[in-house]
């Protein structure tokens, strides 16, 4: 494939710890290493950002921002690119991208929409999100030359994606999240971290990784805490890696449940240090609910050889199966507790057997080189489709 000029549009980007931004970072850096000209357009952020390699990152002061929704007018005027790659959800970014398609120079670029998850919320925020999902999101999907979905299972659970799947199936391409299987791999034990946290050598430690802020309310660490309080085996501990304004409230919940000594909050952990946390653990738990659509931390844990307990709903169940862990109903702390007890009861050898199956699956399905190859193919299809549209309109 000839080198392309690629513009990535993303609401968040490292150092913000969200999965969508980290996925954008990995694709952008990997594409630049392959010789493409890559530019990332995102909002300014605080903190130390990882090296983007040869990718150019434009951190632009937004005119305004509502949470993780920055208004950056420049996004409507991106000329001279072969591909505009929008990472959804991106409130304001989606509208500006659609506005840009009205400009002759901008609409020459193929539009690729990388769909991560629906917008969902409660109260007035939920009403706004629902309106957005019935107006802007479907319009964006109709305009896209190619739509990248995390799994067909998840796409069928979203009405406008399911409609696109039925009407124009060639426009949808499965593009799961990826994991660096060299960085996230089984390794030396994390006895140092366990000792520092006061976790006994013969105890079983479950890892939970999430940003603990209001934007990630659906991660449901409260379900994991309640499940730990209900376990039959009292030697199970929970290591929570993640910071945010909700952390203190969750710490209070653990104390109120009488398990403050078995729940260990690390606050925010840099992404590069997550492998150490996972290697210090015996298993992984993901009690998230919609709109979570995949769970990057889940495949990172599996790549480290950990068996997992995860919520059974579209997207996540495309990742975890009976050979690699246990699926439980959303919000069911009793089912989570039972799964934790079963993993504890089977001992280290049983957990290692399940973890090895997860590691094997990560190597087969989510390693970055194969995903970068697939992205090149998706871009080629999008460019061909865009050229056909331009030719028909001439």
Task: For the regions a language model picked out, list residue spans one by one.
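Conserved donor-binding/catalytic core segment of Leloir-type glycosyltransferases
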Residues: 200-219, 225-228
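A short helix/loop element that forms part of the nucleotide-sugar donor recognition site in Leloir-type
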Residues: 185-199
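Short alpha-helical donor nucleotide-sugar binding micro-motif in glycosyltransferases
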Residues: 141, 268-269, 276-281
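Short hydrophobic beta-strand element within catalytic cores of glycosyltransferases
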Residues: 307-310
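Nucleotide-sugar donor phosphate/pyrophosphate-binding loop at the beta->alpha transition
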Residues: 110-112, 119-143, 156-164
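Conserved acidic donor-binding segment of nucleotide-sugar-dependent glycosyltransferases
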Residues: 321-322, 326-334, 342-348
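A short, active-site helix/loop in glycosyltransferases that binds the activated sugar's phosphate group
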Residues: 138-174, 179-186
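Nucleotide-activated donor-binding/catalytic signature segment of Leloir-type glycosyltransferases, i.e.
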Residues: 251-269
């Amino acid at each position: 494939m000839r080198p392309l000029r690629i513009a990535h549009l993303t609401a968040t980007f490292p150092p913000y710890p969200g999965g969508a931004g980290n996925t954008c970072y990995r694709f952008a850096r990997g594409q630049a290493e392959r010789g493409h000209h890559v530019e990332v357009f995102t909002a300014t952020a605080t903190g130390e950002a990882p090296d983007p390699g040869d990718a150019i990152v434009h951190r632009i002061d937004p005119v305004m921002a509502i949470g993780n929704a920055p208004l950056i007018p420049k996004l409507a005027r991106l000329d001279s690119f072969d591909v505009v790659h929008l990472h959804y959800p991106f409130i304001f970014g989606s509208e500006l991208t659609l506005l840009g398609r009205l400009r002759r120079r901008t609409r020459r670029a193929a539009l690729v929409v990388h769909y991560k998850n629906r917008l969902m919320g409660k109260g007035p925020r939920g009403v706004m999100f629902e309106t957005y999902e019935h107006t802007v999101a479907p319009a964006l999907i109709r305009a896209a030359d190619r739509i990248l979905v995390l799994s067909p299972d998840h796409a069928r659970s979203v009405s406008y994606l399911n409609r696109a799947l039925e009407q124009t199936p060639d426009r949808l391409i499965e593009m799961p999240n990826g994991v660096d299987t060299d960085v996230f791999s089984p390794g030396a034990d994390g006895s140092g971290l366990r000792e520092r946290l006061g976790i006994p050598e013969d105890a079983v430690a479950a890892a939970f990784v999430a940003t603990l802020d209001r934007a990630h309310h659906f991660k449901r660490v409260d379900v994991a805490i309640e499940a730990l309080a209900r376990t039959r085996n009292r030697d199970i501990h929970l290591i929570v890696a993640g910071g945010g304004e909700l952390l203190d409230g969750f710490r209070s919940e653990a104390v109120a449940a009488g398990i403050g000594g078995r729940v260990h909050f690390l606050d925010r952990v840099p992404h590069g240090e997550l492998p150490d946390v996972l290697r210090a653990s015996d298993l992984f738990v993901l009690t998230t609910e919609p709109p979570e659509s995949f769970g990057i931390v889940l495949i990172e844990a599996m790549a480290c050889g950990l068996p997992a307990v995860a919520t059974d709903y579209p997207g996540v169940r495309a990742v975890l199966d009976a050979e690699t862990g246990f699926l439980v109903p959303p919000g069911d702390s009793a089912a989570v507790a039972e799964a934790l007890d079963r993993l504890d009861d089977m001992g280290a050898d049983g957990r290692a057997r399940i973890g090895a199956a997860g590691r094997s699956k990560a190597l087969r399905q989510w390693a970055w080189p194969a995903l970068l190859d697939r992205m090149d193919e998706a871009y080629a299809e999008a460019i061909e489709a865009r050229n056909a549209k331009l030719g028909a309109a001439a």
